[in-house]
Amino acid sequence: MSSKPEPKDIHQPNGTGPTPSPCSSDGPGREPLAGTSEFLGPDGVEVVVIESRANAKGIREEDALLENGSQSNESDDVSTDRGPAPPSPLKETSFSIGLQVLFPFLLAGFGTVAAGMVLDIVQHWEVFQKVTEVFILVPALLGLKGNLEMTLASRLSTAANIGQMDTPKELWRMITGNMALIQVQATVVGFLASIAAVVFGWIPDGHFSIPHAFLLCASSVATAFIASLVLGMIMIGVIIGSRKIGINPDNVATPIAASLGDLITLALLSGISWGLYLELKHWRYIYPLVCAFFVALLPVWVVLARRSPATREVLYSGWEPVIIAMAISSVGGLILDKTVSDPNFAGMAVFTPVINGVGGNLVAVQASRISTFLHMNGMPGENSEPTPRRCPSPCTTFFSPDVNSRSARVLFLLVVPGHLVFLYTISCMQGGHTTLTLIFIIFYMTAALLQVLILLYIADWMVHWMWGRGLDPDNFSIPYLTALGDLLGTGLLALSFHVLWLIGDRDTDVGD
C-alpha cells in the first residue's frame, strides 16, 4: 500500500525510530496508525510509541539547554514540545554554583565598597549639606540597577538560556528593544524619584524650595538616563560573553550589573548634582532645559521598544513593579537622610551601599535562577508542579534537595565571609567614621544575615506566586526584591547604629 511508508516518515523525524513488531508486518493493522484509538495491535505497542516520543523530546530539550548554539531550527510547536517532567535546566552542584557566583559576587561587593567610599566623601559636599534631599535619591537611583539593569540582565539571561538569542537577527532585536525599554523606564523613574525626594523632604520639615526641586529633577533624570545607558551596554556584553564560554549568565550577569552599577550611579549623581548646584546662582534655567531634553527623547525610545515583541508587553505592563520599587527605595532613602544628617551616625554612610548592594545582588541571582528554571518547564501561568505552591516554609526554601534550594544555601553562606572581606577593605582604606570593633562587627553581621535570609525566603515565594498568576518574574520580581533589600538593609543598619550608640559604642572620628 502506498500509505505504508507514511507513518514511518511521520515518526522518524521526531526521533521515535520504530523497530519491527508483529503488528508492523500486518497490513490491516497498519492503516489505523493515524489514530491510536483505532489501533488494532496490542496495547504495549502504543505505549512504546508514546514513550519514545517523550524520550526524544527530552533529549532535544536537554541538548538545547546544555550545549551552546545547539538550538534546532525546526519550528516545533512550543505547547507540544515540552514533556510532563523535563529535566533540570542545568546540572549544577553546590560547588559549581558557588564557584560561578563567587568571583562576580566579590567583584560586585568591591563595587559597593567603592560606592560607599564615594558616599562617605560626598556627604560632606556643599550640595549634600544644603540640599539634603539628595540623600533620598541615593537608594532610589542605586536601586535602578535592580529595577532596570538587573531586570534587563535576568530577561536576557533567560532568553539566552532558552535559545532566543542564538541567531544574529534575534540577538539584534533583543538588544535594541531592551536598550530602548530601559531608557524609557530610566527617564520616567528618574523623574518620579525626584518627586518622591521633594515630597519626603518637604513633609517632615514643611520647607519647599522650587530651585532645589528643579535641581533634584534634573540631577535624577540625567543620572538615571546615563547610568542605564552605560550599564545596559555592559550587561549585553557580559551575557553574550558568558554564553560563548559556557557559563550560566544567571550566575554572573546580575552581580556584575551591580559591581559597577552602584559606583557609576553614585559618581554620576554626585558629579551632576554638584555641577548643577554651582549653576544655581548664575543660570537657573539650565534645570528645566536638562529635564526637557531627556523628556523630548522619550518618543524615540518608545517607538524602538514597541518594535520588539519581547519588550512591547513590558513597555505597557511593566511599570507597576518599577514605580512601587522606587517608592520603597525612597523610604529607605528617607531613613538614610535622617540618619546620616545626624553627626552621631555619620559612619553609616560608607556601609549603606555595601549592605544594600550585597543583599540585592544575592537575591537577584536567586530570583533570576528560579525564573529561568520555571521558564524551562513552561510559560507564566502554567503549573508545572504536581501540587500547587502556597507560601513555602523556610525548611522548603533552604533545606529541600532541589537545585533552587541548593543555590539559596550557597548564597546565604556567602554573606559572612563576603562582608568580612568588604569590612576589612574599608578598614584598610581608612574609610568611614566608625571603628570596626568586635561588637560592631557582630551587630553588622546580624543585620546582614537577617536581611539576606528574609530576602531569599521572599524570593522563593514571590517568584512562584507571580509565575502562577501569569506574570513573568524576570520583569516583576527583581525590582520588588532589590527595593526590599534597600529598605531592610538601611533600616536594620540604622537600628544597629542606634543600639550601638545607646550601649556606648560612639566612635565618629575614624576617617576624618
Curated annotation (Swiss-Prot):
PTM comment: Phosphorylated.
Topology class, membrane: Multi-pass membrane protein
Reactions catalysed according to its record: Mg(2+)(in) + 2 Na(+)(out) = Mg(2+)(out) + 2 Na(+)(in)
Gene Ontology MF term list: inorganic cation transmembrane transporter activity; magnesium:sodium antiporter activity
Composition-biased stretches (Basic and acidic residues): 1-11
Annotated tissue distribution: Expressed in heart, brain, kidney, liver and colon.
Top-level lineage group: Eukaryota
Biological processes annotated in GO: cellular response to magnesium ion; intracellular magnesium ion homeostasis; magnesium ion transmembrane transport; metal ion transport
CC annotations in GO: basolateral plasma membrane; protein-containing complex
UniProt entry keywords in alphabetical sequence: Cell membrane, Ion transport, Magnesium, Membrane, Phosphoprotein, Repeat, Transmembrane, Transmembrane helix, Transport
Subcellular location: Cell membrane; Basolateral cell membrane
Induction behaviour: Up-regulated in heart, brain, kidney and down-regulated in liver by low Mg(2+) diet.
The family this protein is said to belong to: Belongs to the SLC41A transporter family.
Biological role stated in the UniProt entry: Na(+)/Mg(2+) ion exchanger that acts as a predominant Mg(2+) efflux system at the plasma membrane. Transporter activity is driven by the inwardly directed electrochemical gradient for Na(+) ions, thus directly depends on the extracellular Na(+) ion concentration set by Na(+)/K(+) pump. Generates circadian cellular Mg(2+) fluxes that feed back to regulate clock-controlled gene expression and metabolism and facilitate higher energetic demands during the day. Has a role in regulating the activity of ATP-dependent enzymes, including those operating in Krebs cycle and the electron transport chain.
Name of the protein in question: Solute carrier family 41 member 1
This protein's encoding gene: Slc41a1
